[in-house]
Amino acid sequence: MVRREKGYDPLRLTVRDHHRMNDTSKPGLKNFPIAFFSILMGLGGFATALRKGEEIFSLPSGGSRLVFILAGILFVLLSSLYLIKIVHHREAVMQELRHPVTLSFFSTLPITILLLSIGAYPEFPLLSKWFWGVGAAGQLGMTLYVLTTWIHQTHFQIEHSHPSWFIPVVGNIIVPVVGVEHAPLEISWFYFSFGLFFWIILQAIVLNRIFFHQPMAEKLIPTLFIMVAPPALGFISYLKITGELTQFAQLLYYIGGFITLLLLVQFRAFSRVKFFLSSWVYSFPAAAITIATLVMYDKTQVIFFRQAGLALLLLLGLLMLWLVVSTVNAIRHHGFCLPE
C-alpha cells in the first residue's frame, strides 16, 4: 500500500495556481515550484532522443528541432515567472532552498540550459557554447551548494531522501556530452568523475531508504525512474570523452538497462499511481536510456540494439503524448494533484 507523506509537495501545482501565475499581485506566484523545470528536462531529453532517432533511422529532422524550440520558449517563460517570484516572494524561494526535497530541484535549471546547449549544437555552435558555459558553471555551483547543505544540515531524516536527490548528480554527468566540443577534455573528465562518484554514494542511500523505511508518498513514486538516468547518461558521456566502447562503458549501459527492466516489470504497480505533475519525471530517464540504446547500436551495429532503440523511442513518444494529454485534462478538471 502506498502511504502519503506529510509535508510540502514540490511538484504540486493546482489549476488555481496556474491561473494566478501571471498576476504578481496575487499569492499564487508564491507557490510556483522550482520543480516545474523538470518538465523542460523531459522535453529536452525527448528532443535529443528524437534527434538521435532521426539520425539512426534516416528520418526528417524537423520534429526534434520543433521540440527544442518549444523547450526554449517554455524555458524563457518559466524562468521569467520564477525570477518574478524571487523578486516578490524571496522568503518562499528561501524555503525551497532549505527544504530537503525541493533543494535538489534547483539543479533542473542549469540542466535545462545544458540540454538547450545540446540542442543548439552543431547548427549554432556559438550559442551552444554560451549555453554550455552558463549551464556548466551553474551546475557546479548548485552541486557545491547542495552538498554543503547536506553536510551541515541539522534536520534531514532518511525519509527525506528519494531518487530526486540524483538530479544534481545527473547534471554533472550531462556536462561532457557537448562539453568535449567547447572546452579542454580535462574539464569533461572533472565533471564526469565527481558526478559518477556521488551517483554511487547516493544510490546506496536511496536504496537503503526504499528497502528499509516507510514507502514514498504516491506522488513521488514516479521519481524511481530517475535511477535510470545516471548510468545511461554516464555511458553516453564516457563515449563522448573517450570515443571508444570499452568494457567500462558497457558496464554503465547494462546497469542502466537492468534498472530500466526492473522498473518496467513493475508496470502494473506504476499504472495504479494516479497522474501528478511529478509524473513528468518519467520522461527524462526514459529519454536517456533510449539515447544510450541508439548510441549502443551506432557503436556495435548489433541489430538487437536497433530494434530495442526503436521500441524505446516509440514508447517514449507515447509517454510524452500521455503526459501532455494528462496535463491538459488535469487543467480542465481543475487540478494536477489529489487533495492532501
Where are these regions (language model features)?
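Aromatic-anchored, glycine/proline-accented short structural segments
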Residues: 194-253
